């Protein structure tokens, strides 16, 4: 059987995959699960749980669903490719700045960013790149209102983080 739930336990779907003999091994298809996603109007993290009834055998996987159409708000964020005077002025007055400087950063460019779990982080193997193991996120920040996340990176971060350029803030002012 399978269940599809959100983080609050709200059921989005469920059913049976039928009964079949399962050989010992890996990557054995249990069947096909189809779910209509069109009714989902805002981004949501879901969890698929598959269980063999009458046993303790259970496994689950997280996945994220985003609506096909979204309405964006222009907001009050200054977007720039460099930490220019306007960005500094905006920050000085408590404003918001997004720096999209990929490929233009020199300090920290020796740090190679890939989206790898700790187990496969090559820092364990002669310090070859990549040198990162993920991110730490303030998941309660208002900017994540429509982007379901936890305090750490997960698979929904793949497109945003994999092979992106690192920006090191070691010598930036603390303020």
Where are these regions (language model features)?
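Extracellular ectodomain segments of secreted/surface proteins
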Residues: 1, 66-70
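Beta-strand-rich binding/interaction modules
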Residues: 1-20, 30-33, 43-53
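Local beta-strand/beta-hairpin segments that build beta-sheet-rich folds
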Residues: 11-14, 28-32, 56-58, 167-175
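Exposed aromatic-hydrophobic patches
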Residues: 26-39, 62
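Catalytic beta-strand/loop cores that center a nucleophilic Ser/Cys/Thr
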Residues: 43, 105-107, 123-175
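Short alpha-beta junction capping motif
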Residues: 70, 75-123
